[in-house]
Amino acid sequence: MRIRYAAACLAACAALSLGGARAEWYVFEADNPPEALLDAAMQVSGFTGEVTVSFLGDCTLGGESKAANSRGGFVQTALREGYDYPFLNLQSLLDGDDVTVVNLEGVLTDRTLDRVKKTFNFKGPADFATILPLGGVELAGLSNNHTLDYGAEGYADTQAALADAGVAYFDADHVAVWAHDGVMIGFTGSAFSLSTGAQKNLRAQMDALREVGCQLIVHSMHAGTEYEREPTSQQKTVAAHAVDMGADLVVGHPPMWCRATNC
């Protein structure tokens, strides 16, 4: 797996095997698409068949720092059992799809950073990022309320850890594109409500994805009330905005269980 970087922004491009051909990931800011993606957009699609995308919802690779040495906690369990352990029972499912998406909550860093004052702050070692590709996960959403648990420095470390592990990501500033044989799927994300500024930014991202040739845009929405069966008015509003801006599919989390669908 290889990573490429664009000059003006972090632009990860991870090569992976897909049916004997190569699929690629691109991560970039809306106003700075990588040249390689623009070249790929000129290809005539020869793809036939289906693309299978799995959405796993909230995922934390670590936990509260005070529990880092707990034998039963995530950190010590992963160190003891191996980095392939967390997704072991999902391996057959995730290895059989084309794209697996998680909402990555928490920070991946090896530095001692000041935590933001809040109820829960999640973090794990930087090399925990490799848990994702070992488990068949190619894409991480970072639009949530835990990516800044250790401030901007922790967030930057998380992005770097994912890039080093060959995992693509999307957030408020970056979109992700999966490209294979002329087919392109774009991914965007949001957390909770969409302010006027956030709406403007999201529209620019979706416009950019269409301009580079994405035939499908997926929006990942982190919003709602945990353990409630029905979507909240906030979720419905954000989903409607995303569709109006160009999303073909909106996937919500983190209610912790399945909710209603609207087709």
Could you describe each region identified by the protein language model?
Residues 24-263:
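Acidic, metal/ion-coordinating pockets
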Residues 1-30, 36-37:
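Gram-positive cell-envelope targeting signals
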